Regions:
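Short linear elements at protein peripheries
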Residues: 207-216
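A transmembrane-helix-recognition feature enriched in membrane-embedded lipid enzymes
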Residues: 186-208
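Enrichment for repetitive, rod-forming helical segments
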Residues: 13-17, 79, 203-205
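N-terminal type II signal-anchor transmembrane helix
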Residues: 2-43
Length: 216
């Protein structure tokens, strides 16, 4: 069979276009679902009993301060001091045993929250929050919370709101500021396109959350 180079080019082009369409479609479905459910101003946020703080590392791989972490802490402190939430579920993971040194997200979050004036007595630590899906579902099934305010950057809040809607959870999001470092913003927001595709792939494959079915 004679190789048809022109036909192959068109096939490759078609595949690329199809992939782009899938990526954009997944992104827009999530964004539309979250429309009107995220807030940039603390005064506009409705009161919810619980704020779910989605974890991230306190330091970057270069051991510099992670402004995504810092800004999430600042955001949840703003909510608490404004009376918009009464307690905090800090959801993340313990990576302190990683080779070469790691970190415990929960300890870092708790200490930072206390430093920002949030009492230890209203902070709940969830060590199963290694995935957004785990954090969302555990908030409902273990902690009994089906009406929550999510705290993360806007793109992450939108995806978390979509996940929450699929689990019967009424979620809104308060948007922490992104990093002021442009390269970090481009990297993280670019990765979000693929994260939203993975969200739908996981749904199609029936991916289940994994967490301990008890409070700590």
């Amino acid at each position: 069979m004679k190789f048809n180079r022109k036909k192959m080019i068109w096939i490759i082009f078609g595949v690329i276009i199809a992939i782009i369409i899938v990526i954009i479609t997944c992104y827009m479905i999530v964004e539309c679902k979250a429309s009107g459910k995220t807030y940039d101003m603390v005064a506009d946020v409705p009161h919810r009993e619980v704020g779910l703080l989605l974890g991230t590392s306190p330091r970057t791989p270069e051991n510099a301060p992670n402004y995504y972490f810092i800004n999430r802490i600042t955001a949840i402190a703003e909510l608490y001091k404004a009376g918009k939430i009464d307690k905090v579920i800090a959801s993340g993971g313990d990576y302190s045993s990683r080779p070469g040194g790691g970190y415990d997200e929960l300890v870092a979050m708790r200490d930072s929250l206390i430093d920002h004036g949030i009492p230890d007595s209203v902070i709940i630590l969830d060590y199963d929050g290694t995935r957004t899906l785990n954090s969302i579902v555990k908030a409902k099934e273990v902690y009994g919370e089906d009406c929550i305010t999510l705290i993360s950057q806007k793109y992450h809040n939108e995806r978390a709101i979509y996940l929450a809607s699929q689990q019967g959870i009424d979620a809104i999001g308060y948007n922490a500021k992104p990093s002021h470092i442009i390269t970090k913003r481009i990297k993280n927001e670019g990765r979000e396109f693929l994260a939203r595709v993975k969200l739908f792939v996981d749904m199609i494959l029936g991916e289940k959350p994994q967490f301990e079915s008890k409070k700590k």
